């Protein structure tokens, strides 16, 4: 029986219940996040009040900062926040001990320390970057509580540092307890699904390319370049998974290697696709058919299915089949450099997938998973210039506010130093987003001022118990947390984050509340001044634009490749790959697909040059190879390709037993020549005159 009517007719009771259930399922996760945020803040305040700490609101603030929509992100952030807190508290004690009576030296070195933390926050990634920033502004927070009207350290700094660090760590622990008790986590599962989806799509398209006749050979450039972008996006998801599981964290090098295995697979796919596109129709069809038939039938069926579930179901069994295929391709009899290239590059694709399957076995807790890779990949710093600029900006901005505070003897001006330190250190790694982020943060802080004033002066005077305080906090944190979770606009998310972070600081709940409106608005003035200084610093001393950073990454890689071509001492292939991987990961989102492809091509050319030079030493053909690589170093692509052909002729005349090695070298020559021909303009740009 229908008891309600919709626009299209009667709605049954079951349909109405279904719609309500669907609506509740949509709002339940953000509502739960709001409840967790509120509960974490209340628990932190309760513990801090029970311990009778001086400023319990720092515990609540820390709990609000640590809370994230994902459990793994919260736990990972909490762990790194704890490290940064201890480091920052230790440093302020050291500074005070070194300069107990020298106000100028103390303030100057505080600015230097914040500059160093800004440098580290730019160099590190994800939550490690946050930890470095925290080490800087924790020192500023403790210094603010320890300084007088115009500066100068106090002998009580050690106890104060211990107290502040304790308050912050209480907030971290309480947030972790609340979130771990109300969320089973899902980052590990999501990461496994992302890895499996990428692996299945990459291998599915690769096998389909091999199965098509030459006349139907698709242009896979756009697809490969989009895959590069998606692989780069895995980096923060890996960090979240590390926060959820100590077992996964112990095996973290395996996950990094799995990510770089995807890059290696895309590099091998690029080599195969580029070479097939340059062959005649008959030769291309024959080569692709040989490679495809060399794959085990069991592996082909999995790859052609293009199903991520098959990769997750039994990654170790698939690993064994892929490993067998790699050995088959490497040992494949080849009588031409073309076939040797196709076999070796296809083996590179599958070898990359072996690393991915190792990572999947870890993520799905497969029995008999491989032992942890203790080596992993060590990422180098892709570019030191942004870190140096951020360090200089932090030092100058914080130093300028310190001088203004000392000169004016502004009683609450120390709060401006803290806000400037927080914004500069947190936003500097964001690059071109830092200026806009600081403006939005200021707007969010203004909203927190209004909300905190309403709660503090309109509600709290009538409340006497801690449960009543929690009820008052719920009025703010529940809707704010709900809005943060449902927001899909970065601007709104930043503004709401600023509101939740600053609310407790402005409310300042302590055992004996102070309702002095003059003091409140003096503190608000200092905070808003700090919020105004940060955007000014970013506008006067702007970060490198994304376009400039992209050009620098490409120029640095091109320079490194030219140096590699003529280097007296070759780096290990692992070191070269780590350097280029770090630049791929750090590449701004604004990079075009072509620019990502150029970095991937440089990765391939560099690795092949290293292998070819090592091979030439064994074959006694270094003179011919050096002549070709010298033109690579000079940016003369056409001449380099011509001399590589001459070197290929020299290798073709190699007698047994080195003929097999020489044939593999001829395949490497083809890879280098085709990559240089495809991206000749890039490899020639920036060459020495």
Tell where the protein language model's regions lie, with residue ranges.
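Soluble C-terminal extramembrane regulatory/interaction domains of multi-pass membrane proteins
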Residues: 198-216, 255-374, 611-689
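Generic hydrophobic, helix-prone segments enriched in Leu/Val/Ile
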Residues: 188, 550, 554, 577-584, ...
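A transmembrane helix-and-boundary motif of multi-pass membrane transporters/channels
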Residues: 1-246, 250, 358-601, 682
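Active-site segments that bind and position negatively charged phosphate/pyrophosphate groups
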Residues: 591-619
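Hydrophobic N-terminal alpha-helices or hydrophobic patches in metabolic proteins across all domains
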Residues: 224-227, 255, 279, 605
């Amino acid at each position: 029986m229908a008891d309600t009517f919709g626009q299209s007719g009667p709605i049954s009771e079951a349909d109405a219940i279904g719609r309500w259930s669907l609506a509740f399922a949509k709002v339940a996760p953000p509502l739960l996040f709001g409840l967790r945020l509120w509960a974490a803040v209340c628990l932190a305040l309760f513990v801090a009040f029970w311990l009778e700490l001086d400023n319990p609101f720092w515990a609540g603030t820390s709990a609000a900062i640590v809370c994230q929509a994902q459990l793994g992100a919260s736990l990972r952030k909490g762990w790194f926040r704890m490290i940064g807190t201890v480091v920052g508290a230790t440093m302020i004690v050291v500074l005070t001990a070194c300069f107990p009576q020298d106000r100028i030296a103390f303030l100057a070195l505080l600015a230097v320390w914040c500059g160093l933390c800004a440098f580290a926050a730019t160099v590190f990634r994800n939550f490690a970057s946050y930890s470095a920033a925290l080490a800087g502004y924790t020192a500023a927070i403790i210094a603010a509580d320890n300084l007088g009207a115009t500066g100068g350290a106090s002998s009580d700094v050690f106890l104060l540092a211990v107290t502040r660090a304790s308050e912050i760590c209480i907030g971290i622990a309480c947030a972790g307890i609340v979130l771990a008790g109300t969320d089973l986590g899902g980052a590990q599962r999501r990461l496994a699904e992302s890895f499996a989806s990428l692996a299945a799509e990459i291998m599915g398209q690769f096998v389909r390319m091999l199965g098509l006749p030459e006349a139907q050979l698709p242009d896979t450039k756009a697809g490969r370049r989009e895959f590069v972008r998606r692989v780069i996006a895995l980096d923060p998801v890996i960090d979240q998974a590390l926060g959820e599981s100590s077992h996964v964290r112990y095996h973290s090098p395996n996950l990094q290697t799995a990510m770089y295995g995807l890059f290696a697979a895309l590099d091998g796919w690029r080599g195969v696709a580029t070479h097939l596109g340059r062959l005649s129709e008959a030769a291309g069809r024959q080569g692709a058919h040989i490679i495809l038939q060399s794959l085990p039938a069991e592996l082909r069926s999995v790859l052609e299915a293009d199903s991520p579930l098959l990769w997750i179901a039994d990654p170790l069994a698939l690993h064994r089949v892929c490993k067998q295929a790699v050995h088959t391709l490497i040992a494949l009899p080849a009588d031409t450099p073309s076939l040797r290239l196709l076999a070796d590059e296809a083996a590179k694709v599958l070898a990359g997938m072996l690393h991915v399957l190792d990572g999947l076995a870890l993520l799905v807790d497969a029995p008999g998973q491989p032992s942890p890779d203790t080596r992993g990949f060590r990422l180098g710093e892709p570019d030191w210039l942004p870190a140096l600029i951020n360090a200089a900006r932090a030092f100058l901005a914080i130093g300028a506010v310190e001088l203004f505070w000392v000169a004016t003897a502004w009683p609450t001006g120390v709060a401006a130093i803290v806000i400037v330190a927080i914004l500069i250190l947190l936003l500097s790694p964001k690059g071109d987003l830092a200026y806009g982020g600081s403006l939005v943060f200021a707007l969010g802080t203004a909203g927190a001022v209004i909300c905190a004033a309403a709660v503090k002066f309109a509600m709290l005077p009538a409340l006497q118990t801690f449960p009543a305080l929690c009820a008052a906090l719920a009025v703010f944190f529940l809707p704010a947390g709900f809005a943060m979770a449902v927001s899909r606009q970065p601007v709104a998310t930043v503004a709401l984050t600023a509101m939740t972070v600053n609310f407790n600081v402005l409310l300042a709940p302590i055992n004996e509340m102070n309702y002095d409106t003059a003091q409140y608005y003096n503190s608000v003035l200092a905070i808003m001044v700090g919020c105004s200084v940060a955007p000014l610093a970013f506008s006067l001393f702007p970060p490198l634009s994304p376009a400039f950073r992209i050009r620098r990454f490409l120029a640095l890689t091109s320079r490194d490749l030219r140096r590699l071509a003529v280097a007296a001492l070759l780096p290990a292939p692992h070191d070269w790959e780590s350097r280029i991987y770090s630049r791929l990961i750090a590449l701004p989102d604004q990079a075009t697909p072509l620019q990502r492809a150029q970095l991937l091509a440089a990765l391939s050319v560099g690795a092949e040059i290293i292998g070819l030079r090592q091979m030439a030493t064994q074959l006694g053909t270094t003179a011919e190879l050096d002549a070709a690589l010298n033109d690579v170093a000079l940016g003369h692509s056409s001449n380099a390709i011509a001399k590589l052909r001459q070197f290929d002729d020299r290798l073709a005349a190699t007698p047994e037993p080195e003929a097999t090695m020489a044939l593999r070298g001829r395949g490497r020559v083809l890879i280098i020549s085709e990559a240089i021909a495809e991206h000749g303009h890039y490899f020639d740009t920036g060459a020495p005159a």
